[in-house]
């Protein structure tokens, strides 16, 4: 079930209705996939525990791979670093806070966001605290760092630029948010000297990394309907920037391709969703709100194929690795899809806990984090 957040009392009735419908809806009917084999062969290089795992599906706790290390965090405040090749634990620290987002890694820092609005920067070498900066509300988006500027987004929609050395605030981008939004935030994407942010009002904005000034802003989806619930068009999925084009998808709205140079829409499709996207040289892959996986021509948005057999499962965003397409799900499976025709070529299970965040690819290795905090490094085994 998608979690929602209220900005004021006007949304109380709508929120109560959503919760009532969810409670009365009963168990979902899961698809029968018993005929699907194991698919793409993988070998487990190593496994480890991050600690307690994630306390909420709204939390953006996802592994980060940087400089031959893997970093991960749990809700209870622990942040850990492992050697990416061997799985040897290099350090672990307890921040003493309930963590909800991260880590982001780069520039010698490991960045995590907390429920109380604190952004923590740790030394990537040993986990020692470098600095702490207070934002305006809980942090549910993965912090980013580029050119010694940390970019973080708070749950109330504000985007911050902070000095990577000290945590001092350099700029803030502040936009009002709708009365009712999904709980959680899309993470900002940094490309060169630009920051791309999907906003809760259905608009995609690009900011200057150095000063936070708006370069362009483009509507992806326009709110429609009479109630606050009907008008929700959060850009909840992380934006994807690929070869000069930004892709964004709205909850209860559209999927759009926008040129990074001028902010003009290239094409738009009525494919609502909130999970995420991936791309390769030819196609864009996206999951819609019915857990159907689409492959679209990146140039014009035309449908190449659609895979419907995973309907009923809660899926992660798709990931492209080694010429393969893979999505994880709530049952602990990796679902392997043929990029050329969309066939479901295999499923393999990695525990019985939900996998709520997409696997993280690095070369021919996937890093997989389950909701209970089990971290696994899997290598593709080619025939």
Curated annotation (Swiss-Prot):
GO terms for cellular component: cell outer membrane
Transmembrane segments: none
GO annotation (BP), single: Gram-negative-bacterium-type cell outer membrane assembly
Gene3D superfamilies, sorted: YVTN repeat-like/Quinoprotein amine dehydrogenase
Lipidation (S-diacylglycerol cysteine): 24
Nucleotide-binding among keywords: no
N-palmitoyl cysteine-type lipidated residues: 24
PROSITE patterns: PROKAR_LIPOPROTEIN
InterPro entries found in the cross-reference section: BamB, PQQ_b-propeller_rpt, PQQ_rpt_dom, Quinoprotein_ADH-like_sf, WD40/YVTN_repeat-like_dom_sf
Compartmental location: Cell outer membrane
Main location: membrane
Keyword vocabulary terms for this entry: Cell outer membrane, Lipoprotein, Membrane, Palmitate, Signal
UniProt cross-references to Pfam families, sorted A to Z: PQQ_2
Assembly, per entry: Part of the Bam complex.
Protein name as catalogued: Outer membrane protein assembly factor BamB
């Amino acid at each position: 079930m998608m979690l929602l957040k209220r900005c004021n009392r006007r949304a109380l009735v709508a929120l109560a209705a959503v919760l009532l419908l969810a409670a009365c809806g009963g168990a979902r009917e899961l698809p029968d996939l018993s005929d699907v084999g194991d698919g793409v062969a993988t070998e487990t290089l190593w496994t480890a525990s991050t600690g307690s795992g994630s306390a909420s599906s709204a939390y953006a706790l996802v592994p980060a791979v940087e400089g031959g290390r893997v970093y991960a965090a749990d809700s209870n405040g622990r942040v850990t670093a492992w050697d990416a090749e061997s799985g040897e634990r290099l350090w672990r620290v307890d921040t003493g806070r309930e963590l909800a987002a991260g880590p982001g890694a780069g520039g010698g820092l490991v960045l995590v966001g907390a429920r109380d609005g604190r952004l923590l920067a740790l030394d990537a070498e040993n986990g020692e605290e470098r600095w702490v900066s207070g934002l305006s509300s809980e942090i549910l988006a993965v912090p980013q760092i580029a050119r010694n500027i940390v970019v973080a987004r708070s749950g109330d929609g504000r985007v911050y630029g902070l000095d990577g050395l000290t945590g001092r605030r350099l700029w803030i981008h502040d936009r009002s948010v709708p009365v009712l939004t999904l709980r959680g935030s899309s993470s900002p994407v940094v490309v060169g000297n630009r920051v791309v942010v999907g906003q809760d009002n259905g608009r995609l904005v690009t900011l200057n990394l150095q000063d936070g000034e708006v370069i362009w802003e483009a509507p992806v989806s326009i709110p429609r309907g009479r109630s606050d619930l009907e008008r929700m068009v959060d850009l909840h999925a992380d934006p994807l920037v690929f070869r000069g084009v930004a892709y964004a998808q709205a909850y209860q709205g559209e999927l759009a391709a926008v040129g990074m140079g001028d902010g003009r829409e290239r094409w738009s499709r009525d494919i609502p969703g909130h999970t995420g996207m991936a791309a390769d040289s030819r196609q864009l892959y996206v999951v819609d709100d019915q857990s159907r996986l689409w492959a679209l021509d990146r140039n014009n948005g035309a449908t190449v194929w659609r895979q419907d057999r995973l309907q009923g499962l809660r899926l992660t965003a798709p990931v492209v690795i080694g010429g393969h397409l893979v999505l994880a799900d709530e049952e602990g499976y990796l679902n392997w899809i043929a990029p050329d025709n969309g066939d479901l070529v295999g499923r393999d299970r990695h525990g019985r806990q939900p996998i709520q965040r997409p696997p993280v690819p690095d070369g021919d290795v996937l890093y997989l984090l389950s909701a209970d905090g089990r971290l696994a490094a899997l290598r593709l085994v080619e025939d």
